[in-house]
Amino acid sequence: MKRLAATIASLFLITASSAEAQQPNVAGRGLSPEDVRRVAPALEKYTRDRLDDEVWNRPGLTPRDRSLVTIAALIARELTLPMPYYFGQALDTGVKPGEISEVITHLAFYSGLGNAFAAVGPARDVFAQRGIGPDQVPQASPPLLPLNEAAEADRATRVGGQFGAVFPGVVQYTTDVLFRDLWLRPDLAPRDRSLVTISALIANGQVAQLTGHIPIGMNNGLTQGEIAEAITHLAFYVGWPNVFSAMPIAKDIFEKRAR
């Protein structure tokens, strides 16, 4: 029932802009399943029967992975009202506090600093309620994971050749900050970084970027089935149009890799 109420809150806010979602009269409006039944009983039924009871129990992704996909979508869309519930659920399904911290940090670069800072408050409150202290989140500058020099050299050459002459600053920061630093931070596995990146891109309708990030994700250990199931899961949180925009790109990548 708690997940149902939180899901209803998140689906309610998905239709609001980020600015609207921050207005007190919206952010403070709690919706119980009973509230929804009084207005849209079918909506409450779909949420309970299809999303809560069915989608979250599908075998294609673990509950932990579904939690990562969901919190990535909420951060990407700056939907702060349901975050406390879903951060708590993430902890309950096996996501570590340090991994939540790293998801927030990671998505600052893929969804914007403002979205990341908006998630800090809800995460702080959940951590406080759970007795999670600063010693359980990653340090600012940990020893980094080893870099795949060949793969990074190929990526840097391609991006530099396309954009380096016109946007040298973006190209340099992409190399120095993202792929030689952020992606190598050890407290969120590369596979999970890819999962939350792909989820955030789909949530924000930035599907052109999937041509790069789905192959990276598969190289990092995501399977075709897991990516397909993440897209299925996201349909309920970010809308069918966003996933239908992503599906042709994902399908094309899957087919090319199978050749």
Positions of PLM-derived features:
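Positively charged n-region of N-terminal signal peptides that target proteins for export
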Residues: M1-L4
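Bacterial N-terminal signal peptides
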Residues: T7-A16
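Acidic, glycine/proline-rich low-complexity segments that act as flexible tails and inter-domain linkers
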Residues: A21-D65, R77, P84-G88, D92, ...
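Short, structured motif recognition centered on aromatic/hydrophobic residues
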Residues: R66-L74, M83, V103-I104, R193-L201, ...
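A short structural micro-motif
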Residues: I75, T93, H106-L113, I202, ...
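Winged helix-turn-helix DNA-binding recognition segment
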Residues: V95-I100
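Preference for long, well-ordered alpha-helical segments
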Residues: N115-A116, Q206, E226-S245
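Glycine/small-residue-rich hydrophobic helix-like segments
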Residues: N204-Q224
